[in-house]
């Protein structure tokens, strides 16, 4: 009888040990799943805006509201900020950066901004050379407000299209095995994906911009701020075609919703 009690106790200890190990293993698996889900959290955070792409008529944004928090004043409907820029090194030690910024105020239903032409030098003794040309959006068309004598530049500005107007991210959920970087203290999150040249958005970018490298780009999804949403932080997309010195080639896109500027 004493033997049976000891055997029962021994078996109970073994079962308890297996249970504890199983719990630890389940805990590790759950923790790993939580770790792995950060990529999904980043994609879901971006999907809130990327699901709207392509936004063929930018004025549709007047009727769309983004993430709101305590930073908004009572009655403020918010402002959408768009930016698309293309930067490329055409000469050693120099990077040419061109693009457009547009502010769509949902209170006034007015959209104003500027086209910029920027030259960045490696040599810090040289002044960064940036020119801005004021624009507004009317009837989904870019109207140039400043006098531009260069006809080629004038046409480029008036025919400018934001990446958000032609990009399509319906397959975003299928992007897998991204390189994930997180810093919860800042907070900051990044997911990088190696694309191929058959990607729909990549082909469109190659049609529009003078991308000379044949290398397929890396897509970077970058979040500054709360991954669940924040009007203080921002999100941006980057297509890095080349990071090689004096061959740098990058497309940047930014679409964010935030409080309106009192002066706008």
UniProtKB/Swiss-Prot annotation:
A lipid is attached at residue 23 (N-palmitoyl cysteine). A lipid is attached at residue 23 (S-diacylglycerol cysteine). It is found in: Cell membrane. It comes from the Bacteria. Keywords: Cell membrane, Lipoprotein, Membrane, Palmitate, Signal. Residues 1-22 form the signal peptide. It is a lipid-anchor. InterPro entries: Csa (IPR007595), Csa_sf (IPR038641). The keyword Cell membrane applies. GO terms for cellular component: plasma membrane. The keyword Signal applies. Belongs to the staphylococcal tandem lipoprotein family. This is Uncharacterized lipoprotein SA0397. It comes from Staphylococcus aureus (strain N315).
